[in-house]
Amino acid sequence: MKTYRITYLSNSRFPSEMANTVQIMNMCHAMAEYGFKVNLLKPYRINQISGASTDLFEFYNLSKRFDIHTVKFIDLSILQKFIPSLMFRSLNYINNMLWENYLVNYYIKNYNKDLIYMRHTLPFAIHKISKLNIPAIVEFHSMPSKRYIKYYKDAFKNSKKFIPLAITKLLAEDISKVLGIDFNDILILPSAVNINKFASNKIVSSNTEKKLNITYVGSLIPNRGVDILITAAKVLKEINFTIIGGVGEDLSKIKSYKEKNDLKNVNLLGFKSQKDLPLYYQKADILILPMTGKEVHTTKYASPSKLFEYMASGKPIIASDLISIREILKNNESILLFEPDNSKDLINKIKLLSSDPDLMIKLSKNSKNLAKKYSWNNRVEKIQKHIQKFNID
């Protein structure tokens, strides 16, 4: 097996409450554990998490197995509230174009023998790298914005050393159609989980004497379906609902709604660290993922890291009935699905599951066993094998 040096290029903010940075850090860590020499290049961005550790390995609860380098960057986010949106988008476009070119030049100067790994969110960098015939893995988590399609088409046409990766089958199909990439060349790999972090978590027991605790972990942005969950909580007052995640305005809105409606059975805990999350999973009786079915991204392209953490935690899961979820789990076998955006159906499924201890245990066991298939290490191993199909030396 050839051991590659890998440089991961990212434009994300670190540390961050966003799941994309958790995925990036875990991928870098898993590649390093596999034997690759890994460097992560990230921009300097203004940190929005109060009191967050500046030690990224501590923040993401990972051992130090790879190197992280901060690349100079002009963070325009502070201007967003003070200038018209059209002006901000134009400035941001120019800023991103200049920085991504600078990032590639920084890579060439310091790491030009490395295989590049990056998400699809760097269109200018991807286009420039393709012209230089540098080998690269491009991981797609959604379809590129229409304004950048030409950059991606040209990039994959220019370079035979670009390896496309998609997190769902439907995303791979759309990438193939729109970008003109052979479907068979696209590696389909969903997200993953650090199994070891949940090793001590036990399968849910059949004891239903205590007050039931339903837990949601994740972002509070509209397409995550937290509004549906809150609606269910208003009806099911005999059940505790714990919501973990969210910062700033998103969290403030939910807090205001909770207070206005006197929802004493809703506990808003805000953002919690990767180190603490397994403990909160352990305290839950049921975990919930109520994503909307009104957006293409959630219905076809989503492979949320939280789903795999839920699976590894050994707790029964209720989730929106989305094609992207069905790619991983089977209804009534390893998960209980409800009609997306339908609070009545969600309420019925909560009542059904909470009244059936045997079903709770069945779903928990099956999903936890299936989670072993989706470890970060297994994901990296599949990438390593796929690389061999391409002449990138």
Predicted regions and their residues:
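Conserved donor-binding/catalytic core segment of Leloir-type glycosyltransferases
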Residues: 7-9, 165, 207-233, 241-242
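Glycosyltransferase donor-sugar binding loop
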Residues: 44-46, 217, 240-254
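Nucleotide-activated donor-binding/catalytic signature segment of Leloir-type glycosyltransferases, i.e.
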Residues: 252-279
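Short hydrophobic beta-strand element within catalytic cores of glycosyltransferases
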Residues: 287-289, 309-312, 316-319
